[in-house]
UniProtKB/Swiss-Prot annotation:
GO terms for biological process: cellular response to heat; cellular response to lipopolysaccharide; connective tissue replacement involved in inflammatory response wound healing; cytokine-mediated signaling pathway; ectopic germ cell programmed cell death; extrinsic apoptotic signaling pathway in absence of ligand; fever generation; immune response. It is found in: Nucleus; Cytoplasm; Secreted. Glycans are attached at N102, N141. InterPro entries: IL-1_alpha, IL-1_CS, IL-1_fam, IL-1_propep, IL1/FGF. SMART domains: IL1 (SM00125). GO terms for molecular function: copper ion binding; cytokine activity; interleukin-1 receptor binding. The lineage of its organism: Eukaryota, Metazoa, Chordata, Craniata, Vertebrata. Belongs to the IL-1 family. Residues 82-86 are annotated as: Nuclear localization signal (NLS). Monomer. Interacts with TMED10; the interaction mediates the translocation from the cytoplasm into the ERGIC (endoplasmic reticulum-Golgi intermediate compartment) and thereby secretion. Interacts with IL1R1. Interacts with S100A13; this interaction is the first step in the export of IL1A, followed by direct translocation of this complex across the plasma membrane. This is Interleukin-1 alpha. Acetylated within its nuclear localization sequence, which impacts subcellular localization. The modification Phosphoserine is found at S87.
Length: 270
């Protein structure tokens, strides 16, 4: 048995299918305050149901807006009906305010989470099998084997590595080039390692074939990380959890100690 060669550099060139993600966030400096932070003072009696710039002089016909300024439409009860973001250093006149009031197609600004939308649309496409019949040894020199029932995995010190479970590791594309998603299938079977919740044993899920695209079944995917001589398998479905071993426990998901999340991948040369 020998350690598997480092494949990370070669795989970086395999991501030609990656999708680019472009943020539509406004090009404002991150240290600028949002226009939602504007402070509102009581409106004069003749200012209800009219547009007026905030924090400006009452005698000025044209005002320069600063970082804290925005334009609002206030109803008689003081409720803000409409807001518009303005460019920095933009002049605004009374005519501009009137145009905003008459704009029937003014866009309503709604809170949203680009990150959530981006993650929910994530797809992982199969690239190739990068390891055939490899063995996983943990930091205690225990090898992964099947438990007596055959339904789960466990770790044990072996004198004969032929008794260890052999895995085929398949790589998938990712929108993040810093991560390498993989699946772990028991060689010559249809059983794939599937992550569960913290401290729960990993499952062996039977599939008809290696998935070509994974979108919803992220429990089958693990981000393979390499630090020094050790390998780690972080769950795509539970990003804080790793495949782990522990004395008198089945192979399970854990964030770290007292469980062991450090492995070495041994290549089968028999």
């Amino acid at each position: 048995m020998a350690k598997v060669p480092d494949l990370f550099e070669d795989l970086k060139n395999c991501y030609s299918e990656n999708e680019e993600y472009s943020s539509d966030i406004d090009h404002l400096s991150l240290n600028q305050k949002s226009f939602y932070d504007a402070s509102y003072e009581p409106l004069p009696g003749d200012g209800m149901d009219k547009f007026m710039p905030l924090s400006t002089s009452k005698t000025s016909k044209t005002s320069r807006l600063n970082f804290k300024d925005s334009v609002v439409m206030a109803a008689a009860n003081g409720k803000i009906l409409k807001k518009r973001r303005l460019s920095l250093n933009q002049f605004i006149t009374d005519d501009d305010l009137e145009a905003i009031a008459n704009d029937t197609e003014e866009e309503i600004i709604k809170p949203r989470s680009a990150t959530y939308s981006f993650q929910s649309n994530m797809k992982y496409n199969f690239m190739r099998v990068i390891n055939h019949q490899c063995i996983l040894n943990d930091a205690r020199n225990q090898s992964i084997i099947r438990d007596p029932s055959g339904q789960y995995l466990m770790a044990a010190v072996l004198n004969n590595l032929d008794e260890a479970v052999k895995f085929d590791m398949a790589a998938y594309t990712s929108n993040d080039d810093s991560q390498l998603p993989v699946t772990l299938r028991i060689s010559e079977t249809r059983l794939f390692v599937s992550a569960q919740n913290e401290d729960e044993p990993v499952l062996l899920k039977e599939l008809p074939e290696t998935p070509k695209t994974i979108k919803d079944e992220t429990s089958l995917l693990f981000f393979w990380e390499k630090h020094g001589n050790m390998d780690y398998f972080k769950s795509a479905a539970h990003p804080k959890l790793f495949i782990a071993t522990r004395q008198e426990k089945l192979v399970h998901m854990a964030p770290g100690l007292p469980s062991v999340t450090d492995f070495q991948i041994l290549e089968n040369q028999s």
